[in-house]
């Protein structure tokens, strides 16, 4: 599915933007702080209904405005359709061909976007929360129903934590069932996705780093020893058992200490934890391999590559990895949006149909390439 046109109003620092992107590569040029990343976030928000950098919708609305709007025309196998999302401090409304959508299945049909930003380079050396976030965003792209499943889990988790802090045993017990059922679904999704991604991560890392590189391993480790290699019903039973074992500790501390919100992704090179033992170059190669694995997995599952959003990544990679990334993008039949402060970093991947835009002070204008 290709993005044919984009309209943005009162989103971050973007007052009003209309963009006709290239079917292949659209490059956004400008200094830092001018709105390049905001434009990428607008596209990401349109395709996922999730912001890139904040959990608060109010921060997405331009200062002084009441609401923001992002809309786009997409061309896919079923023809052209218009999707839009209105955002306000109190919430958001998704629209498909002008009609508000309560159920989002039709809205998300065919939409998938993978974003690669400098913060992603912290996936290896950062804490487990970032790795869980990566996996859950990738799972959402693979199975959009994950969005609703994650919300069910978060609701049950917050309610149980409140009951633990409030000293309400009966209320706490009433939320244990919904929590373990929703948690088991999340564990199953993560497990299935890691099984799909793991061999692709290993292959991509070897291609990036060369045949002499150590073997990259990507594995899922649920919290508290809950084994993921079972069916969903047994997963729920094991989660419930783990909760029962930790009940007194959870009551003392006022929060749930086991479940998908505490799980970990293991990244290792030749069996040694990458966070502690990998060099900076190896860590960045691993992150690049993770992103390429996600892209290739979606390409295989959907029959087409996802929309690609790359935020000033070339400036964060060494020349060898940047050449690999640009060569990969040039060979991939995908629509891509790239931001940079230095046009020379992107030029090797530019083709005759690459569109260049200048972004300055929240204004976007086309450049003659």
Curated annotation (Swiss-Prot):
ATP binds at residues 30-37. It is found in: Cytoplasm. It holds the Pfam family SMC_N. Disulfide bonds: none annotated. Keywords: ATP-binding, Cytoplasm, DNA damage, DNA repair, DNA replication, DNA-binding, Nucleotide-binding, SOS response. One of its GO terms (cellular component) is cytoplasm. Coiled coil: none annotated. GO terms for molecular function: ATP binding; single-stranded DNA binding. It comes from the Bacteria. InterPro entries: DNA-binding_RecF, DNA-binding_RecF_CS, P-loop_NTPase, RecF/RecN/SMC_N, RecF_2. PROSITE patterns: RECF_1, RECF_2. Belongs to the RecF family. The RecF protein is involved in DNA metabolism; it is required for DNA replication and normal SOS inducibility. RecF binds preferentially to single-stranded, linear DNA. It also seems to bind ATP. PANTHER family: DNA REPLICATION AND REPAIR PROTEIN RECF (PTHR32182:SF0). This is DNA replication and repair protein RecF. It comes from Anaeromyxobacter sp. (strain Fw109-5). The gene is recF.
